[in-house]
Each structure stands twice: as C-alpha cells, then as structure tokens.
Amino acid sequence: SRCTHLENRDFVTGTQGTTRVTLVLELGGCVTITAEGKPSVDVWLDAIYQESPAKTREYCLHAKLSETKVAARCPTMGPAALAEERQIGTVCKRDQSDRGWGNHCGLFGKGSIVACVKAACEAKKKATGYVYDANKIVYTVKVEPHTGDYVAANETHKGRKTATFTVSSEKTILTLGEYGDVSLLCRVASGVDLAQTIILELDKTAEHLPTAWQVHRDWFNDLALPWKHEGNPHWNNAERLVEFGAPHAVKMDVYNLGDQTGVLLKALAGVPVAHIEGNKYHLKSGHVTCEVGLEKLKMKGLTYTMCDKSKFAWKRTPTDSGHDTVVMEVTFSGSKPCRIPVRAVAHGSPDVNVAMLITPNPTIENDGGGFIEMQLPPGDNIIYVGELSHQWFQTGSSIGRVFQKTRKGIERLTVIGEHAWDFGSAGGFFSSIGKAVHTVLGGAFNSIFGGVGFLPKLLMGVALAWLGLNTRNPTMSISFLLTGGLVLAMTLGVGA
C-alpha cells in the first residue's frame, strides 16, 4: 500500500457499522482507513497547486545600457538640455562641472551638465512574482484500496484513483473497481496566508540552482531593483542599476552596476523553495478535512474457498513496517483464486487470534495477491500463514500505544476545529459530540478492544453502566457510568 512507504502515517479505524469517517490530510502524510466488513483504503493529499497564477511585478537583475548622451553648458549660459530627458525608459542625471578657457568657455565657473542613457534589461535576467488566487487553488486527493499486491515506493498502484477539490467543490465519488465506490467531501485550507504570499521565480540560467521561492509580499515589494508590470515595455526605477561618475567639463561616465542575481540569491538563503511543474505552481503546506463515505465499499473474495495450507512459501518474511505494523508477502503453488488463512497467537495463548488485519480478507488472485499487513499486541507472538510460521516480537507497550493514538486523535480534532461542531440543532450538537469522542478516542479504544467481538463489548458497556446505577459510592458510580457510556458509545457509534 502507499501508506506503508511513508513515514507520516495515521490509522483511522471505524466502529461497528461505520459508514462515514472524518480524516485530516496533510502534504507528506497518509491515512489508512480500516472498518469491519470493508476493504482497507489509503487516502492522502498528493498536491496543492494553482495553474498559471497571475503575474504581479517583474524585477530586472542586470541592466542593459545603450545610447549614452551628454550635454554641457558654459557658466551663465543656462541649463544644459537633452531631448532624452523627456523620454520614458531613459535614465538621466544633472550636475555641475568646472568650466573655463581650457574647455571652450570664456568664463571660469560652474556650468550645467546632463547625461542620459537608455536602460533595458538583459535577456534571462528577470525575477517575476506570481500571486495565488484562493478560489483557483486545486487540492489533489488520492485513494488506493489494499488489494493484497505488493507495490514498490516508486511504482503506481493500478487501482489508484484521484479526486480534485477547490473551495467550491462538491462531493466526489470514486469507483475502485471490484471494491465498490468511495465518496469524498473535502474542506480545503492552505497552510499559508495567500494574501501575503508571492512566488518569486527567476529565469532559468543554471541547472544546479533553485528557480522559485515562496516569499512575503512586503519583502517582495521592497526589493531595490528596477520593476515593471507585465506588458509594460519600460522599467520603473531603472536608476537603481545605473551609477553616474563625477562630471569633468563636458564628460560624465555612466556605469552599469552589473548582475544582481548573486545578491538576490544570498538574500533568499533559508527561504522556502517553491516547486514548479510545467504551469503548475505548488504550495508547500496545507491540509484538507474530508468526510469519507464507506457505505458502498465492498469486500472482494468473500466467496473464495480457503487456500491449501501446505502450498505457501515466504516471498518476504515478516518485517516491521515502521508504523507499529508487520508486513509480509507469500507465494502460493495451488489452485487460484483463494483466501489466505492467516492468524497470530500470543505467547501462552495458542487458541486466541491476536492479529488485527490491516489487509482484510487477504487473497491469492490469478494475477497477484499475497501481501499481508497486520497489527500485533506488544510482546512475543507467532504468525501463521497456512502451515508457515514465524516468531515475532512486537516492541512497545499497550499503554504507550493507547496514549499515542489518543494524542493523534486530539491533533485531528484540533485541525478540524470549528467544522467538527454543529450548533444548528440539538441533534446535530449531540452528533458532533459523538464524532469528537470517536475522533479522539477511536484509536485508543481499538488498541484496547481490537480483538474483542461486538457482543462482548456491548455486554461490557451495559454491565459497567448497571454497576454505576447500583453503586452507592458517588465517585465510583460516576466512574462506572462514564466508562460504561464510553464503551457503549464507541461500540454502537457509526461515526469516526
């Protein structure tokens, strides 16, 4: 699965009868949804971008100077003048120079002098700013079912589907082939202040250098370089890259300050680099909150017969995935398709299956299958696939796992924020409370009661509530009632 190869992975486990779960997706992360009677699905936010954003300013990094002209007057002869002073795109400077008999003036003193030069910009020496439009930013969400096929990190799963969202998008339904349909309704949020963000892009001149950065609007507007808007042939403040020398009689030198690319690159050190792909300008941060509908998902292979236990061989022995799960792959030499008999037992309890399958109903197909992912309780375990067996020690502790999943649940609820609550009606408010409880405590509840059936959990919740009602000690009564209520809510709830 896609999530197996990513470091930032989260699990959302639906309760009995779950038809809808709420996910928080961020760039670089991946969420695996598991629900009883449904195929497991990986969902992740693949990209945030805008196609062809609007240009704001262009800055010139290296001036191109031409057609230098100088005019001078003797003392008392009035100001020197050039027609170029009134032309757009020309940089001029007025000054006074020493005049006398040695340079063709009858009087000694200060005479007027003016120099002008035509200023343009060298080719491939521009820095252009682009602005995002929140209404045009596209959020790409990808969905992939767990099919039992091993897919390398650099390969694409054949069952992978893509949905795109903007601020005005409606619900999207994706068809996952034999696994049914999944619906997505996503609320989008960028991780940056778009009104104050500019993408600064340089003309490409060297392959080893980055070409775009994500900068603040005020910093961009304060750059001390010549600038213009798109379509304007003339540069504003072109004098910023031109220097005039000291006047000498009828002469004034004009100097080009040279290429400013190095100065700009030094100023951009440490600034987030922007990614540009064709005409797509990508954002580096952001998230989407998605309501995922699971009601039309269906399990594949339920009608298959069980595989012959004696005809399995390890292709990849059980390995730690890095996500508190175990992954493995087997080959099968018997008749296909069929269902893989897989289970795990803890040390000292040979009759209790402790494996929580992330790959539900693993199968061998005519053209693939055999990849299995499962979660095991901490401690010594034995994994069985048919007649194959493998000793496995799962690191960690049950208490630590509960706290970790609770922390992730709180983080999810915090990111969802105000969208998690519905104050429009009493029913909506109480439904929001239920969803919040599932979001925060769902992972921890599944860690504790993952191997317990629906009916035992229901009876346990009823028993705790009954004890609370019949206990005379107020503190114990409230404790039993709260615990029983939580167990019943997590067992009977349909939201997560």
Swiss-Prot record:
Q: Which residues are glycosylated?
A: 154
Q: Name one GO cellular component term.
A: host cell endoplasmic reticulum membrane
Q: Which Pfam families match?
A: Flavi_E_stem, Flavi_glycop_C, Flavi_glycoprot
Residue intervals annotated with topology Extracellular:
1-447
Fusion peptide: annotated span: 98-111
Topological domains on the Cytoplasmic side lie at 469-479
InterPro entries noted in UniProt: Flav_gly_cen_dom_subdom1, Flavi_E_Ig-like, Flavi_E_Stem/Anchor_dom, Flavi_E_Stem/Anchor_dom_sf, Flavi_Glycoprot_E_cen/dimer, Flavivir/Alphavir_Ig-like_sf, Glycoprot_cen/dimer_sf, Glycoprot_E_dimer_dom
Q: List the disulfide bonds.
A: 3-30, 60-116, 60-121, 74-105, 92-116, 92-121, 186-290, 307-338
On whether Metal-binding is a keyword of this UniProt record, the answer is no
Give the Gene Ontology MF terms in alphabetical order.
protein dimerization activity
Q: Does the keyword tRNA-binding apply?
A: no
What GO terms describe the biological role, i.e. biological process, of this protein? clathrin-dependent endocytosis of virus by host cell; fusion of virus membrane with host endosome membrane; symbiont-mediated suppression of host innate immune response; virion attachment to host cell
Q: Which keywords label this protein? A: Clathrin-mediated endocytosis of virus by host, Cleavage on pair of basic residues, Disulfide bond, Fusion of virus membrane with host endosomal membrane, Fusion of virus membrane with host membrane, Glycoprotein, Host endoplasmic reticulum, Host membrane, Host-virus interaction, Inhibition of host innate immune response by virus, Membrane, Suppressor of RNA silencing, Transmembrane, Transmembrane helix, Viral attachment to host cell, Viral envelope protein, Viral immunoevasion, Viral penetration into host cytoplasm, Virion, Virus endocytosis by host, Virus entry into host cell, Zinc
Transmembrane stretches, start-end: 448-468, 480-496
Report the NCBIfam families cross-referenced here: flavi_E_stem
Q: What is this protein called?
A: Genome polyprotein
Q: What is the lineage of its organism?
A: Viruses, Riboviria, Orthornavirae, Kitrinoviricota, Flasuviricetes
